From Swiss-Prot:
Responsible for synthesis of pseudouridine from uracil-55 in the psi GC loop of transfer RNAs. It catalyses: uridine(55) in tRNA = pseudouridine(55) in tRNA. GO terms for molecular function: RNA binding; tRNA pseudouridine(55) synthase activity. Belongs to the pseudouridine synthase TruB family. Type 1 subfamily. NCBIfam families: TruB (TIGR00431). The lineage of its organism: Bacteria, Bacillati, Actinomycetota, Actinomycetes, Mycobacteriales. CDD domains: PseudoU_synth_EcTruB. Its EC number is 5.4.99.25. This is tRNA pseudouridine synthase B. Transmembrane segments: none annotated. InterPro entries: PsdUridine_synth_cat_dom_sf, PsdUridine_synth_N, PUA-like_sf, PUA_sf, tRNA_psdUridine_synth_fam2_C, tRNA_psdUridine_synth_TruB, TruB_C. GO terms for biological process: mRNA pseudouridine synthesis; tRNA pseudouridine synthesis. The keyword Secreted does not apply.
Length: 309
């Protein structure tokens, strides 16, 4: 059995995120592999995978902020807001000045309401939006709040009657960079779509920690053990042996260190935090609720605490 942990993969273009999971299932010889945060097939870059019990924490990673390098083509709008769709509108964009582009980019920073791209995995009445679009159905997705902490122009260059804009983006989870490209083009009156996308960071995990799939095939290895990952991502709380046993049973709300049924007191730590046994191993992820705690994920059940895994 593979040890539990996270693998930071540099996803190549042309593969779906599920393709990467399938490849890593073969590399690590386990079916228990999942990913945090889908990348479109045309995109490259950071894809965080969980192996074995580390799949339990992937849902918490999907909410992490993300960073991207991207190229936006101004002067063409497409059916998918990226280069994989059909061109539905072309406008000569050669008149655009760098000042006009910078001003439009600035208008898309901060807290905004973004309409996701219709060709997306968002569910509408139980079906993925992209499937409805393929069936010829009209799809209207509601705008939702996202935060764009950085949207910076790195380079501008002519591409025929279009203008290609290289940008860097730091954004909240749930942001569609394709939609940013669309909205930038709309703000400038010329249309726009995404021609390249590379994710450079997911939360604490960046390209500097990422492995290529060929590297992993030659030498399967984790980027972080499950304990290392939990302590990197979350705050830490040290438990007594009795508290650790209770947390391992999922009884954090009634973790009686002395068998008296009292709830485990709040730690005063914001958000989810890692609860550690006296030997330093992570037992569970907890969250304060008022004066008490709630178990979010049991990392190491009580039945495993006598072992070394």
């Amino acid at each position: 059995m593979s040890p539990p942990g996270l693998v930071v993969v540099d996803k190549p273009a042309g593969m779906t995120s599920h393709d990467v999971v399938g490849r890593c299932r073969r590399i690590f010889a386990t079916r228990r592999v999942g990913h945090a945060g889908t990348l479109d097939p045309m995109a490259t870059g950071v894809l965080v995978l969980g192996v074995e019990r580390a799949t339990k924490i992937l849902g918490l990673l999907t909410a992490a902020a993300k960073s991207y390098s991207a190229t936006i083509r101004l002067g063409q709008a497409t059916s998918t807001d990226d280069a994989e769709g059909d061109v539905v509108r072309s406008v000569d964009a050669r008149h655009l000045t760098s000042q006009a582009i910078e001003a439009a980019v600035g208008g898309l920073r901060g807290d905004i309401h973004q309409v996701p791209s219709t060709v997306s995995a968002i569910k509408v009445a139980g079906k993925r939006a992209y499937k409805l679009v393929r069936e010829g159905q009209a799809v209207e997705l509601p705008a939702r709040p996202v935060r764009i902490d950085r949207f910076e122009v790195r380079d501008l260059r002519a591409a025929g009657e279009c203008v290609d804009v290289d940008v860097e983006v730091d954004c909240s989870s749930g942001t569609y960079v394709r939609a940013l490209a669309r909205d930038l083009g709309a703000a400038l009156g010329v249309g726009g779509h995404l021609t390249a996308l590379r994710r450079t960071r997911v939360g604490r995990f960046g390209l500097e920690q990422a492995y290529g799939l060929d590297e992993l095939a030659e030498c399967p290895r984790l980027s972080y053990s499950l304990d290392e990952a939990c302590l990197l991502i979350f705050g830490r709380r040290d438990l007594s042996a009795d508290e650790a046993e209770a947390a391992g049973n999922g009884r954090a709300l009634a973790a009686a260190a002395a068998g008296n049924g009292r709830a485990l007191a709040a730690a005063g730590i914001d958000g989810v935090y890692a609860a550690c046994a006296p030997d330093g191993r992570v037992i569970a992820l907890l969250r304060d609720e008022g004066a008490r705690t709630r178990s979010v994920v049991v990392i190491r059940p009580a039945t495993m605490q006598d072992g070394t895994s």
